[in-house]
């Protein structure tokens, strides 16, 4: 599948078939993720693959509406390894939100290419996620949760803004 085809085919998925996801597919997604660009090529991320039903229920309890987590075969938890990200110095932004976001984007496109669906989840209680997955304090920041599986049916496509609404040249318009 061409990259632009994967971008156009990408949808948020909240209902999944109960088909197990093989380790080979997880490894392929991790491989795509590691190819994502990052500041100074530090790759400051850690991906936690959750298949345990009890852990998935705990994670669902940490999410604002639990959307898509309980019925997904896998929940991916994307973390930023704080000691490996560029530091906030001199008023510059720490790179990890962008670095991990890029890595998740690569993973999502690779998932679409494999016929899998995902759905970024950002509304969660980080402390509950950290506790459920035994993430040591100060070791990592949980950036997003992503249910993963074979889509039962993709959510309907949402309208997109025209490029004219998104672009301006040589200044903010």
Predicted regions located by residue number:
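Glycine/small-residue-rich phosphate/adenosyl-binding loop
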Residues: 25, 30, 35-103
């Amino acid at each position: 599948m061409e990259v632009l085809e994967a971008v156009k085919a990408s949808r948020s998925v909240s209902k999944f078939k109960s088909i197990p996801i093989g380790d080979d597919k997880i490894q392929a997604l991790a491989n795509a993720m590691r190819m994502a660009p990052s500041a100074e090529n530090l790759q400051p991320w850690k991906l936690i693959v959750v298949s345990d039903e009890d852990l998935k229920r705990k994670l669902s309890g940490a999410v604002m509406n639990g959307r898509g987590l309980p019925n997904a075969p896998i929940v991916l938890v994307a973390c930023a390894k704080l000691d490996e990200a560029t530091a906030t110095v001199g008023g510059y932004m720490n790179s990890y939100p962008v670095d991990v976001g890029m890595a998740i984007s690569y993973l999502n496109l690779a998932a679409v290419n494999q016929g899998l669906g995902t759905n970024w989840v950002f509304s969660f209680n980080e402390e509950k996620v950290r506790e459920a997955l035994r993430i040591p304090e100060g070791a990592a920041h949980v950036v997003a949760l992503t249910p993963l599986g074979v889509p039962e049916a993709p959510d309907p496509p949402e309208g997109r803004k025209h490029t004219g609404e998104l672009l301006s040249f040589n200044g903010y318009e």
